[in-house]
UniProtKB/Swiss-Prot annotation:
Residue ranges, Cytoplasmic side: 303-379
Protein name per UniProt: Junctional adhesion molecule-like
Extracellular side, ranges: 21-281
Family as reported in the entry's similarity comment: Belongs to the immunoglobulin superfamily.
UniProt effect for mutating D59 to A/K/N: Loss of interaction with CXADR
Organism per entry: Mus musculus
Gene3D superfamilies reported for this sequence: Immunoglobulins
């Protein structure tokens, strides 16, 4: 039904209501916007007039280059906005057509979207066509994983690149520690709030600041004094009117800069937390194998240590004995030789003379020296 409506509406718009060949047009200079893959971009198309007039028609065209053929992104006529082709569900007319505004919001930007976007706008009861080109450059997708140490401060960026200011109406930051856990509000901003300020709630109170410039469509935040419990998934929802653009950041909190890098994937569900992953299983198997291989070596080392200890003890005993023998002084054994008186009758009545002989005895000699008795008979 929608395709049939397009076939009917497009010829009606482009033929009867199309611009005559001689219709004058006004082209302004083309601003440049740079946006990362997956983000949103707002391309302004505002007619600057002192009086406000109702927009009669808006066409947004895309071409890779100035000389390339153009394709329709979106067209607006008679209060009907129709996105076309590959831009369906991603392009939205966000300008206030009652105030000369035909701005376009393009969500989930892809690399193929890089090129020149031209807005052609005509006001009611005027023949002049206003043309405003915007050059879009698409950069690689920003990393979704952010690592920070405990106690440090980290920035989390969330913005809409735009040629116009003051288009963001609301910003919400939410936190979840897992896929099945309840979300917590980190920060909330609403342009309709009386205070016009943001609110940080719950355990993030007094630790979160809105550092982005809301007037420039920037809802970035700063998280201070990071805790281990802050690890998880942070989702930024930034609104232009009722249209929401989302950005997800996975925050990993580490103890120090030398700690092993945590896997960038968010916590899994289905009870997988209690199951070892492949890397852990390999590490455990390696430890077990190493233990079995090193056990015999350990046993040999223990036995060798005991044998060395026993040998050292024996040597110490021998040396102690030798030292003891050297320290003890020489001992002499004195023995007396008994003298017997003789009643033998001899010449001049002279009696025999008795003498005592001392021989040294060494402790190391196998046998003690015997007592030697010698008698010298008197002449």
């Amino acid at each position: 039904m929608l395709c049939l409506l397009k076939l009917i509406v497009i010829p009606v718009i482009l033929a009867p209501v199309g611009y005559p060949q001689g219709l004058p047009g006004l082209t302004v200079s083309s601003p440049q916007l740079r946006v990362h893959v997956g983000e949103s971009v707002l391309m302004g198309c505002v007619v600057q007039r002192t009086e406000e007039k109702h927009v009669d028609r808006v066409d947004w065209l895309f071409s890779k280059d100035k000389d390339d053929a153009s394709e329709y992104v979106l067209f607006y006529y008679s209060n009907l906005s129709v996105p076309t082709g590959r831009f369906q569900n991603r392009s939205h007319l966000v300008g206030d057509t009652f105030h000369n505004d035909g701005s376009l919001l393009l969500q989930d930007v892809q690399k193929a979207d890089e090129g020149i976007y031209t807005c052609e706008i005509r006001l009611k009861n005027e023949s002049m066509v206003m043309k405003k080109p915007v050059e879009l450059w698409v950069l690689p997708e920003e990393p979704k994983d952010l690592r920070v140490r405990v106690g440090d401060t980290t920035q989390m960026r969330c913005s809409i690149q735009s040629t116009e200011e003051k288009r963001v109406t609301k910003v919400n930051w939410m936190f979840s520690s897992g896929s099945h856990t309840e979300e917590e509000t980190v920060l909330s901003y609403d342009s309709n709030m009386r205070s016009g300020k943001f609110q940080s709630l719950g355990r993030f109170r007094n630790r979160v600041d809105l550092t982005g410039d809301i007037s420039r469509n920037d809802g970035s935040i700063k998280l201070q004094t990071v805790k281990e419990s802050d690890q998880g998934i942070y989702t930024c929802s930034i609104y232009v009117g009722k249209l929401e653009s989302r950005k997800t950041i996975v925050l990993h909190v580490v103890q120090d800069e030398f700690q092993r890098t945590i896997s960038p994937t968010p916590p899994t569900d289905k009870g997988q937390q209690g199951i070892l992953n492949g890397n852990q299983l390999v590490i455990i198997v390696g430890i077990v194998c190493a233990t079995f291989l090193l056990l015999p070596v350990l046993i040999l080392i223990v036995k060798k240590a005991k044998w060395n200890k026993s040998s050292v003890s024996s040597m110490a005993s021998v040396k102690s004995l030798e030292n003891k023998e050297k320290i003890n002084p020489e001992k002499h054994i004195y023995s007396s030789i008994t003298t017997w008186e003789t009643t033998e009758r001899g010449i001049s009545g002279e009696s025999e003379g008795t003498y005592m002989t001392m021989n040294p005895v060494w402790p190391s000699s196998p046998k003690a020296s015997s007592l030697v008795r010698s008698s010298v008979r008197s002449k």
